[in-house]
Amino acid sequence: IAMKIGEITQVYYAGINHRNAALAKGITSWRDDRCTAAALGHNGPKIAPIIDAILDINRSTDKIRYGDRNIKIPDAKVRFYIDFETINDIVEDIKSDRPITTTQSYIFMIGIGWKVRGKPGWNYRCLTADTIDSTNEKEIFLSMHDNMLEIVETNDAFEDCTVFHWSHAEKTLYDHTAEKYLDDLGQYSGYLNWEWYDLCKLFTSTPITVRGALTFSLKDIASAMYRHGFIQTNWAADGILDGLNAMIKAAECSENAKKKGISMAELPVMKRIIEYNEVDCKVMMEIVEFISNDLHPAPSSKYMSKITRKNKRTIPEVIANEWHEIPTKKTKIMPEVLDDINELPKSTTRPRKRKLPDAQEETQNDDD
């Protein structure tokens, strides 16, 4: 219904107050040409142009627009696509029909998708906690590092890998969890100098707008790109619909697993959450590959790094015929945490590889 009537609060950064501002001007739908960022009350130089870009493409016949075509996504040898499923104080402890709030927050699932340059296959591993608590969170968090290190070592890509994610939330969550288990990360000292790349920031900074997407949520962008035939993967209509639903279902699974004395990864509902998580990871990969192929061929990464170091300019200052990279945070975790890890005694042996339960084994598709 909201899409049918052009509900204004569907639009990026448009809340009730912004809708009221539009209604006061006789504007009842975002499809109205008079509906602009200014009409909604947005006049700042950062958000207003993005809102107008979204509204413009959604009132046009174009499928995708780039605010700047001179962008380059890192072409690392190993491209990781990481997605955390978390449970927070909204649904951590379910004792009755209604969730009981707590102050705890845990990662209960980590999806690791990756592709290797020159190899067509899509790879995915899912790490799922046996139950939702700090002990199991730590186990899968450390296992994530074991698995990723094994992958980069196998492909000789210690200095040539990028970790893609969607929005700052993933990186912030990683940083906070790393702080929580700092002592245990000492075994990885010197091995974790990964580049993190925020795809949502790429879309908002450029901006890249897609007809059918009114926000920059992964589901909005990926679903719109799927409808246009830009990507081939989408979430199942009868599956886990969103992250909130995944949290609620995971909380129920954790309680059931404790009662039965089994891992919640064995429960059918968790298998659906794993499928949902893989789609999150895979659509990021397909988005990266579509944009990379849709834009001009990129120069080598060495050439790009020289350009970036030489110019030392912000994106708006880069001339139109010069390639550039969207700035990304290149430390694996917050600098102060990184320093703390590197000061810990370095293990004399490589970190151990944690064996995955049968329900969490790796999937690979060579057809993609």
Predicted regions and their residues:
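Arg/Lys-rich low-complexity patches in intrinsically disordered regions that function as generic
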Residues: K329, S347-K355, D368
